[in-house]
Amino acid sequence: VTFSDKLNIDSLCKENENFIYAFWHDQLLMCPFTWKNNFDILILISKHKDGDIISKVISYMGFKTIRGSTSKPGKIKNKGGFIAAKQILSSLKNNVCVGIAPDGPRGPRHEVSDGIINIARMSNKKIVPVALGFNSKWTLNTWDKFIVPKFFSRINIAWGEPIGVDNEDNSQFQILLKNKLDLLTKNVNSFQ
């Protein structure tokens, strides 16, 4: 495992400041490998059936999860989004970091929803983008092209600069976070 730009989060940890860390949904399975800090962390996982598998794997690695996802517009069915948001805000208030895939649980792929921006604004916490690259991997035929690294694959992890969210329009922060995640993803996948 190779870490790049870890100073971005080390400085937050030294200041005892927890944060929201953001990663693309296709990298969700391996996101626990990014975590080498003193803070507790919770990772948001959907309530869909595929989320059950990912939640079990991440829990097996020693991490806790928050289960919830959004419903499609016009649907009455609640998939736990409101409860998950309350748990996330409570966790952030109690000095716990939270990991969120801003393009999950149903996409579109590599597009930032406004949920993570709203959580950052309500909690007054920074968003720290992170990306993982693998020199050998399988890419599943799913909406997000979910990545499963092959055994003995080298992992490259890069942390971006923290993003503070103010009262400006969500769209500018969505674009900023997308650009940072895309650049980090490009950089971590450029190694052999």
Briefly describe each language-model feature range:
Residues 5, 23-25, 45, 161, ...:
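Pocket-edge structural micro-motifs
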